[in-house]
Amino acid sequence: TIFQVDLTYKNISDFAKQNGRLVPISPQNAQWNVIKDYNDEHKDQPIELTSAESFQVSDAYAWVLENRYDAYFDIKLSFEKAVTDKDGAYHQYADKLTWFPYKGIPTYPLLHRDSKNEEFSKEYTKAIKELKEDGTLEKLSKKYFGEDVFSYVDK
């Protein structure tokens, strides 16, 4: 999430090149690793990564609006619910805040390890592979998210 005034940030590389100030992230958060990985791949132009134990999401939006920080690493669905949705808590700032994608954070189902779930796990993995190969996952993603969210996940 960035302040509309800062539209010179078209992507994460622009943000890094212009020494953008990122709202602190908890090291336990998957978003921390996304920025850490970016920095590892772009040692010549890293993003300053500051840790935070916890804060309210509402604080992050306020900090960006107050220009204390240039961006808040927000998940698209959270941004849409809070800002773009007409009933969102920050919808009154929809003309002042914007968002751009960078990378998907892979998620995985967690299954209890036992003999019953071992077979289920194999069948689940097989089914997901088939759905990916036949284009069903992409179609469902476009239907429900308006885009292929799988394209953001590193292969």
Model-based region annotation:
Residues 33-37, 65-104:
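A ligand-binding cleft/hinge motif common to bilobed small-molecule-binding domains
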Residues 21-25, 72, 110:
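Short, well-ordered beta-strand segments
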Residues 28-52, 91-92, 126-155:
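Ligand-binding clefts/hinges and TM-proximal coupling segments of bilobed small-molecule sensing domains
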Residues 15, 61-65, 109, 124:
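Hydrophobic residues within well-ordered alpha-helices
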